Amino acid sequence: MSGVETVGVHADAHRDSWQVRAQKQITYEVRFRDDVFGLDSTDLLEAGADGAGSRRRFVVVDSAVDALYGSRIREYFTHHGIDHSILVMRVGETVKDFDTAGRIVAAMDAFGLARRREPMIVVGGGVLMDVAGLVASLYRRGTPFLRVPTTLVGLIDAGVGAKTGVNFNGHKNRLGTYAPADLTLLDRRFLATLDRRHLSNGLAEMLKIALIKDAELFQLLERHGRVLIEERFQGRTGTGDRAAVRALRAATHGMLEELGPNLWESRLERSVDYGHTFSPTIEMRALPALLHGEAVCVDMALTTVLAYRRGLLDVAQRDRIFAVMTALGLPTWHPLLTPEVLEAALQDTVRHRDGWQRLPLPVGIGGVTFVNDVTAAELQAAALMQHRLAEDALLLRA
């Protein structure tokens, strides 16, 4: 994370007070890079360090990633003559907390991390991105870090934005900061070892972007979604390769296009909050049964029905959306969609969005609007219809 600080100080002699105004420009990069840990790649060694940099690196690696790629990661740093310390961590939503963050801090202290010259490197999925990003933003009040996401959620969602966080008091990401990594390297080769469920999990976030702003991406998922899963975005066929490249770039560009002008969320009408109104509560109450993207898809299915009932979608569009969700291996219903849970979820979201629902609903496929007048009765009716449509979609797929 780089930038220039500008400061102005104004003294008011009549009030015996001073007003300080400061601005800091933030610049960060998201870059596609095949074979990040190939011995000829130096991206990770050139980014994020002030001045002359250092030949030392502290690296946090997800334990599942370490089991598959650990020897290659160690070989990479050894080959380049980097004095490195690797902290291997088991992470997940159930341990996305301050205890996990504290373990990273303790390891950084033990390594003796230099504040500016030795950016922390984070290699793993979205949960690790969030926790380690929070640590980087807090450690000595701000330490640069680099991200190498290894899951689809990480590549197109958690790894490209500025938000960090941990769960607290039963709430998802209740404590967090805005702290983008100086550089995020997106390497689709990591998806080759991702299981089908976690691929589907990430496809939910890709579908979110498609539904709120990219009809062409929706059509791509409609036509080639199953191929993307079968080939794990590795492009084993010409069709699969073209689809994988287009889908990953469209989703990443779409996400950054939405985040960039509103990085600090000064505007709370955020189209990328689609699928994230009810899902935080559902996901936390369902732990560990639902993955993040699965909860998001359940939310999107509900809000698709809300949009249909309000005339924002026609029946054909509604059914196409449900069909794609099902084809991608995503749930469109969950027993937690009760009136009590939906009301609690909406109330918490209203507090998060400063007193208004600011609920994004799809308009057709590829458009979005925001509403503030959804009622409990409307939610209950939509959930009942959603349950029926979910069962119908499963029957059609069978």
Swiss-Prot record:
Q: Is Ligase included in the keywords of this UniProt record?
A: no
Which GO biological process annotations does it have? antibiotic biosynthetic process
InterPro entries linked to this entry: Dehydroquinate_synthase, DHQS/DOIS_N, DHQS_C, EEVS-like
**Which residues of this protein are catalytic?**
K163
The entry's keywords: Cobalt, Lyase, Metal-binding, NAD, Nucleotide-binding
Keyword DNA-binding applies: no
Q: Which Gene3D superfamilies match?
A: 3.40.50.1970, Dehydroquinate synthase-like - alpha domain
Q: What does this protein need as cofactor?
A: NAD(+); Co(2+)
Pfam families, per the entry = DHQ_synthase, DHQS_C
The GO terms this record gives for MF are: 3-dehydroquinate synthase activity; metal ion binding; nucleotide binding
Q: Which reaction does it catalyse?
A: D-sedoheptulose 7-phosphate = 2-epi-5-epi-valiolone + phosphate
Cofactor, how bound (note):
Divalent metal cation such as Co(2+).
Give the binding site residues for a divalent metal cation.
Answer: E205, H276, H292
Which SUPFAM superfamilies does this UniProt record tie to the protein? Dehydroquinate synthase-like
Q: What class of enzyme is it?
A: lyase
Supply the EC number(s): 4.2.3.152
Give the similarity note. Answer: Belongs to the sugar phosphate cyclases superfamily. EEVS family.
What is the purpose of this protein? Catalyzes the cyclization of D-sedoheptulose 7-phosphate to 2-epi-5-epi-valiolone. Does not use ido-heptulose 7-phosphate and 3-deoxy-arabino-heptulosonate 7-phosphate. Involved in the biosynthesis of the acarviose moiety of the alpha-glucosidase inhibitor acarbose.
Q: What is this protein called?
A: 2-epi-5-epi-valiolone synthase
